[in-house]
Amino acid sequence: MKINIMAVGKIKEDYINAGIKEFLKRLKPYTEVNVIEVDDERIPPNASGAQIEKVKEKEGERLLKNVPKNSYVIVLDVKGKPMTSEGLAKSIQNLQLQGYSNITFIIGGALGLSQKVLDTGDYILSFSHMTFTHQMIRLILLEQLYRAFKIIKGEPYHK
């Protein structure tokens, strides 16, 4: 199983980068993880609704052109469906059984995702009703993926 994490923008905070690096290292025995960052679009000050949509569309185009063919696409969005850690593990197992060798998670930028990206997703996932920074959600996603693979393998970590 190959996991792709596609995200808008670069991580600037050292503490988040350290956490991401740690979970990427922990995931190596279980799966290959590729993190693909696309440039974020400059947001005009006092941006209008139309300008906001334009930013999301441009970022969305950059994301979508990097999605591998035949990949199962999970889009992270606050309006998506919640899932437990056990549910994520089961979903990954089920996707493997269905013949998927590639899962792509898409994380939007500061303004979220375009409707086109949301429509492209095979599943829209919400980690919480709360809003997190797009940088923080990358770390949370990696931790949940690590937890999911530990659950799948029946190894201690998940309580």
Curated annotation (Swiss-Prot):
Major subcellular site: cytoplasm
Protein residues bound to S-adenosyl-L-methionine: L76, G108, F127, S128, H129, M130, T131, F132
CDD domains noted in UniProt: RlmH-like
Gene3D superfamilies in alphabetical order: 3.40.1280.10
Superkingdom per UniProt: Bacteria
Function in brief: Specifically methylates the pseudouridine at position 1915 (m3Psi1915) in 23S rRNA.
Protein name: Ribosomal RNA large subunit methyltransferase H
